[in-house]
């Protein structure tokens, strides 16, 4: 172990204060860590993150919660759907393939210049368009699953061509 590093329930804190995870976190543990994050925040950000989480699970009951990148809640189904980051003045939902999604309700209001990701910044007091967010989540899941089935069919056709 590094001199001066400390160990927590989530992993090892390095001397630079970074959380260093030894193993991937199991889904049950990830959900418990998201619960803990919501409680730790204890303000409007915790309530917003809890609401976002609720809407994600309503939109796709099969979604999997993960805990990645030194403490970021991640929701996946066939690949990463979105993350839930909390900052001092904003709760940010970053959609991994957001640039490929149609957003008729114009929920995306951040990371608009990127070629792949898009984000929704939720500020204190803002109301979430629940129906539009659920539609966006469902579209992100469908895009992930569509990509998986395309890659499976490509592999199968390459195998047939090779034989």
Predicted feature locations:
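Charge-dense, helix-prone N-terminal extensions
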Residues: 1-163
